């Protein structure tokens, strides 16, 4: 262990970490496969399809059904409150900044479309299943729980 005037190696590293300035917000500009958001928004759909992942390319190359077409119309238009049951629409750069409410099977979950979501499905950002929270055993689950008082 090397000890010098400033202290041990560990304390020197700790001081160096603390002295670094913490940056707030986004440290670097958003880019998707080397393209900025502005460049992506200026691209035609054919150019954009070439840089998207295979699953998104395949989905966009096929014709959309009626529900998907209606949702895309709303997303590209000037609608304020967009509620939908359609979860299988690929997020495109023109949708960035829109606020969408997607149905999860029970209620609508509201979120804003961010640049990092490009190329993903709408349904990926709304969970359909609740997180399991285990508690004590139910009535009749064990022999001793038969005699537990109900709430």
UniProtKB/Swiss-Prot annotation:
GO molecular function, one term: rRNA binding
InterPro entries assigned to the protein according to its UniProt record, in alphabetical order: Ribosomal_uS19, Ribosomal_uS19_CS, Ribosomal_uS19_euk/arc, Ribosomal_uS19_SF
Chain residue ranges for the region called Disordered: 1-23
Record GO biological process: ribosomal small subunit assembly; translation
Pfam families, per database record: Ribosomal_S19
Top-level taxon in the UniProt lineage: Archaea
Biased composition (Basic residues): 11-23
Entry keyword RNA-binding: yes
Keyword ATP-binding on entry: no
UniProtKB keywords: Ribonucleoprotein, Ribosomal protein, RNA-binding, rRNA-binding
Free-text function comment from the UniProt entry: Protein S19 forms a complex with S13 that binds strongly to the 16S ribosomal RNA.
Name used for this protein in its record: Small ribosomal subunit protein uS19
Organism: Thermoplasma volcanium (strain ATCC 51530 / DSM 4299 / JCM 9571 / NBRC 15438 / GSS1)
Lineage: Archaea, Methanobacteriati, Thermoplasmatota, Thermoplasmata, Thermoplasmatales
Name of the gene this protein is made from: rps19
